[in-house]
Design a protein with these regions (language model features):
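NAD(P)H-binding glycine-rich loop region in Rossmannoid oxidoreductase-like domains
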Residues: 1-17
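Catalytic helix-loop patch of NAD(P)-dependent Rossmann-fold dehydrogenases
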Residues: 16, 52-96
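Conserved Rossmann-fold NAD(P)-dependent oxidoreductase catalytic core, especially the SDR/UDP-sugar
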Residues: 23-71
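C-terminal substrate-binding subdomain of Rossmann-fold SDR/epimerase-dehydratase oxidoreductases
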Residues: 171, 175-260
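Glycine/proline-rich active-site loop of Rossmann-fold NAD(P)-dependent oxidoreductases
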Residues: 91-94, 106-127, 138, 150-154, ...
Length: 260
């Protein structure tokens, strides 16, 4: 059990359930000789999506080594959860994989109802951005980022963004990542079967981005100031999924299939 988003609990409640309960679970495993655990972390362990203090990511594709800059209780709780796993790997020889699940985490029926309309409207906005000059598109993203950061820092203020713009920025700050619930469960099973030494975070995302766009174009339009460190291929994810592939996991459900 955990509180999955900041709005569902007070900062203290989020920390108590997400962190203290995790510590107790690890301690119980240590007391009873259990030496392998799979932890439900989140793509938000980096702090990009919910953070009250806005920042830009260092590079794309985002991988497990990207620095964490958490400034909200939920993201911080996931950062601490991963630190708890590292602590018990060091002190009790408990091996663990901390699965950083991407956006989605619902059944196909729920995703079709809630996510698909957002994706369709996001594609319309992307089409308009693509028709602008590179300078104008970058200026538009800077404007959206400014207001999005302001919204998170001052949640009681009236937003200067439209509902569709807020939705697009939400997708952006989850790196246009996606994972369906049953696929996430399959990743957990594979992680339990995979023997590792120590503790590692691992992104669990579909290998394709949610908008099913050429990744190079998506990165240029939506992250014009971010360094791209590896060549993108077709509609691939902006989040590196190779560590998950190393345990035999590759998502069989893409966000694009929800629309078909």
């Amino acid at each position: 059990a955990a509180i999955p988003v900041p709005r569902l609990g007070t900062p203290a409640a989020i920390f108590d359930l997400n962190c203290a309960a995790t510590f107790r679970l690890f301690q119980a495993c240590a007391d009873h000789g259990i030496d392998q655990i799979v932890v439900a972390s989140s793509i938000n362990a980096i702090g990009y999506h919910f953070g009250r203090l806005g920042f830009e990511i260092d590079y794309l594709p985002v991988d497990e080594e990207h620095p964490k800059t958490t400034s909200d209780p939920y993201s911080f709780s996931k950062q601490v959860t991963e630190d708890i796993a590292t602590y018990f790997a060091r002190t009790a020889n408990i091996n663990s994989l901390c699965l950083r699940f991407g956006a989605g985490l619902q059944s196909l029926s729920m995703l079709r109802e809630g996510l698909v309309p957002k994706l369709l409207r996001a594609r319309e906005q992307m089409d308009r951005l693509a028709q602008m000059s590179a300078t104008a598109a970058a200026d538009q993203i800077r404007r959206l980022r400014h207001h999005h950061d302001d919204d998170r820092q001052h949640p009681d203020k009236e937003s200067q963004l439209t509902a569709d713009e807020r939705s697009l920025m939400g997708l952006r700050h989850n790196f246009f990542s996606f994972i369906e619930l049953a696929e996430a469960c399959r990743a957990i099973r594979l992680a339990l079967m995979h023997k590792i030494v120590g503790s590692q975070p691992m992104f669990v995302v579909d290998s394709r981005n949610t908008l099913n766009m050429p990744a190079q174009v998506l990165a240029q339009l939506m992250y014009p100031e971010v360094v791209v460190r590896a060549e993108f291929s077709e509609n691939q994810s902006l989040v590196d999924w190779q560590r998950a592939r190393s345990i035999g996991f590759e998502s069989q459900v893409a966000a694009a299939e929800l629309i078909d």
